[in-house]
């Protein structure tokens, strides 16, 4: 199937827009030591902030379901409004409280925009091509880390701590205009408009949908156990500063780019279920070998490369899989999928800091164990083909 030029323009533009808010979402971890110092926050406090951010995000489906009730474009625009407000807050409220508000609002923006745009492509792209298309849009996640985060580091290092947030504010406003101009107004007729309660009821009555949400929960919990502490681990072990931490982000971003490219290339061919299984099993192995590769900087970078490659392949393969589980409530299920990911990150954040004093190896082993739970849940995910 050859995609129309208009669809390609929407794919590319949505990828760039997602790169902007993903940069805001991802910049925190590699520059965590610098941000902690700048906002006078300790590891325990920032861990609780991450947990609060993710747990507040668990209510995001109420907001994100707007894509089912008011249209996909409305959901995307609402997400960019939240993002712009979040960056505006920290520019004018440069305190720990302002930083927490930024964390929450940028996460809510992601949680509202992302299911809306994924549901949009789920509506117009056949299931047997959806892995290819969504794999391309997910490149925004790795672009944020190996392009966006180093740019943030440059502004942070050469200008000041607030400069990156001002840049993100400008880009957020431009992104709003891009969505407004390139995506069609698609508000469903009032007579056919589903209610939030109806759609959520469909999800919670579906064992397959609940299993899919559990897979996402476990994958993200496992990843966050490493995500929260890897910057501190590199800093504690090797004394890496801003530029070197930005380099680490580039290494991880390249790994994720390869993982996303792998989804576009092979997930539709081998089946989404098999792709997720391969990715999660690979991440189990990567988690277990990561602590043993931390004797040198390059060894640590290589271990992180494999860890994020396998994680990204598994989580991006989950997206087209979930779009086919419950087509009748696709937008609401995708919203709950993002909420499940946020809940997983919240749980992982709560567990990461208490585990780290025992050694980084404890975080890695715990991540492997939780990934095994994801594999168990995957057995119960059944797709309703709608291609």
What are these regions (language model features)?
Residues 1-5, 184-212:
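Juxtamembrane intracellular "pre-TM" segments in multi-pass secondary transporters
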Residues 59-94:
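Conserved MFS/SLC helix-loop-helix module at the cytosolic interface between two early adjacent transmembrane helices
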Residues 60-71, 260-271, 356:
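Helix-to-loop junctions at the C-terminal end of transmembrane segments
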Residues 136-180:
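Helix-loop-helix hairpin linking two adjacent transmembrane segments in secondary transporters
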Residues 273-318:
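C-terminal transmembrane helical hairpin of 12-TM major facilitator-type secondary transporters
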């Amino acid at each position: 199937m050859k995609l129309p030029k208009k669809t390609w323009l929407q794919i590319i533009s949505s990828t760039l827009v997602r790169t902007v808010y993903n940069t805001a979402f991802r910049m925190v971890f590699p520059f965590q030591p610098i941000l902690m110092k700048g906002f006078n926050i300790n590891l325990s406090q920032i861990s609780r902030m991450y947990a609060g951010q993710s747990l507040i995000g668990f209510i995001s489906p109420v907001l994100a379901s707007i894509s089912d009730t008011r249209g996909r474009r409305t959901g995307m625009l609402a997400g960019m409004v939240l993002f712009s407000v979040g960056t505006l807050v920290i520019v004018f409220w440069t305190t720990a409280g302002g930083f927490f508000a930024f964390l929450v609002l940028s996460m809510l923006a992601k949680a509202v925009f992302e299911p809306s745009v994924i549901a949009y492509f789920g509506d117009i792209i056949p299931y047997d091509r959806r892995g290819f298309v969504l794999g391309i849009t997910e490149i925004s996640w790795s672009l944020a880390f190996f392009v966006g985060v180093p740019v943030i580091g440059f502004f942070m290092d050469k200008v000041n701590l607030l400069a990156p947030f001002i840049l993100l504010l400008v880009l957020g406003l431009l992104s709003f205009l891009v969505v407004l101009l390139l995506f069609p107004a698609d508000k469903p007729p009032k007579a056919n408009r589903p209610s939030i309660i109806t759609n959520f009821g469909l999800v919670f009555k579906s064992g397959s949908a609940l299993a899919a949400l559990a897979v996402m929960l476990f994958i993200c919990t496992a990843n966050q156990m490493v995500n929260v502490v890897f910057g501190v681990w590199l800093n504690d072990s090797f004394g890496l500063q801003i530029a070197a931490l930005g380099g680490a982000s580039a290494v991880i971003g390249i790994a994720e780019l390869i993982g996303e490219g792998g989804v576009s290339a092979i997930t539709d061919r081998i089946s989404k279920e098999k792709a997720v299984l391969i990715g999660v099993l690979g991440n189990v192995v990567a988690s277990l070998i990561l602590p043993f590769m931390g004797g040198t900087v390059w060894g640590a970078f290589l271990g992180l490369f494999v860890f994020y490659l396998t994680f990204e392949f598994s989580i991006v393969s989950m997206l087209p899989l979930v779009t086919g589980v419950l087509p009748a409530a696709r937008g609401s299920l995708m919203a709950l999928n993002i909420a499940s990911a946020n809940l997983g990150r919240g749980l992982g954040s709560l567990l990461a800091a208490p585990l780290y004093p025992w050694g980084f190896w404890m975080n890695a082993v715990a991540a492997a164990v939780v990934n095994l739970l994801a594999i168990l849940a995957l057995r119960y995910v059944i797709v309703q083909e709608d291609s």
